[in-house]
Amino acid sequence: MNDFPWLTIIVVFPISAGSLMLFLPHRGNKVNKWYTICICILELLLTTYAFCYNFKMDDPLIQLSEDYKWINFFDFYWRMGIDGLSIGTILLTGFITTLATLAAFPVTRDSRLFHFLMLAMYSGQIGSFSSRDLLLFFIMWELELIPVYLLLAMWGGKKRLYSATKFILYTAGSSIFLLIGVLGISLYGSNEPTLNLELLANQSYPVTLEILFYIGFLIAFAVKSPIIPLHTWLPDTHGEAHYSTCMLLAGILLKMGAYGLVRINMELLPHAHSMFSPWLMVVGTIQIIYAASTSPGQRNLKKRIAYSSVSHMGFIIIGISSITDPGLNGAILQIISHGFIGAALFFLAGTSYDRIRLVYLDEMGGMAISIPKIFTMFTILSMASLALPGMSGFIAELIVFFGIITSQKYFLIFKILIIFVMAIGMILTPIYLLSMSRQMFYGYKLINVKNFSFFDSGPRELFLSISILIPIIGIGIYPDFVLSLASDKVESILSNYFYG
């Protein structure tokens, strides 16, 4: 059963099925939409089935592994495999992409191309999470950028070309560092290139060289995460992109950067990570405060939510930097948690825009009476974003706190200072999120406008909102469901460190 190429099928299926849509006769936008949704649902069911029957949670080693010779000339292999670190992100990718496709129903212009790009992005993201070969990881990383650029450049606001150009300059520029790191690591210390991640995990390097590799990978993943000061592409991109694209960006794309930090920087380069972790922790703490302070000054609704994403990614960076079992588990839980919360907030921001055609918060107000369902869902998900107890964000941030407290690597005074600054950031978070809700839904601005009337959530939008809310509450009540997937892998990664 395990010899069956599950992962190859899971990676190749979305882009292959999407390609058929481009060559088949155009049957109307509705056919394209339902075809894409059926592909996404089938892919998600296939992934879930493959993992349920073949993945063993108590095994930290690579499972469902596939190893095929691909290009003889380069001695290049198609290596796939999953472990506790990648299974959660792959399932998150399937879930969010399916809902984003359903959210994209209002898109009518170039519908075939739009849905093909979403499916191509789907393949690239799953390929990145399941690659066990460093060069294959890089190829999948780059494959995923092209659909994102086109989705940004062709569908969105008035400044979409500017934001798409900024996105590609940042990400393509950072990919140069990723490629240099991949080639450097693969060519070091052997006559033949070594690209197998399992072999590279046992490789040791001179200190200076390991630091150089670490910095190269860190720059690449810092842009994607994003880590300040390499975050400035994110608010512009979210501000202009169609909200279904924003769901994919916030829900999955940002998580690829955090995944790369754990998979490559932390697992392959433990000595350099141990040296850089105090600085990363300081940067993560500053990021929480900076984003929480900058967000209230944003007039654009989606830009304000984008800065909340930057703030939440700070907790992931701190968890990764703590080099402890609770810290890293908390970071992985926050990756999954914010994937749901970020996607949900952008979806609700987009549905609000579909009704009032306004993007600036100071022009909104008084919508709560007319659209009570959207108001209720937005309020609940804002509470999830500010880490209300019972929601997934609360337990993730709490575990990260425990990770800092239990870390033996840092002095007590340093830990107290970090926790104090993080606490200030957590106080600022409700201020900008509740202020955002107040500006949107309370007051009388739109009610006093002549001919003011718009409809509340329909069945599709309500289904989408509830579908994302269920896992947020589910993880908040029973986080062990997610934590149990990665716990053995986390212990395996931390066994390379002297602190734990």
From Swiss-Prot:
Keywords: Chloroplast, Membrane, NAD, NADP, Plastid, Plastoquinone, Quinone, Thylakoid, Translocase, Transmembrane, Transmembrane helix. It is an enzyme of class 7 (translocase). Its main location: plastid. One of its GO terms (molecular function) is ubiquinone binding. It is a multi-pass membrane protein. It is found in: Plastid, Chloroplast thylakoid membrane. One of its GO terms (cellular component) is chloroplast thylakoid membrane. The keyword Transcription does not apply. Belongs to the complex I subunit 4 family. This is NAD(P)H-quinone oxidoreductase chain 4, chloroplastic. It comes from Capsella bursa-pastoris (Shepherd's purse). The gene is ndhD.
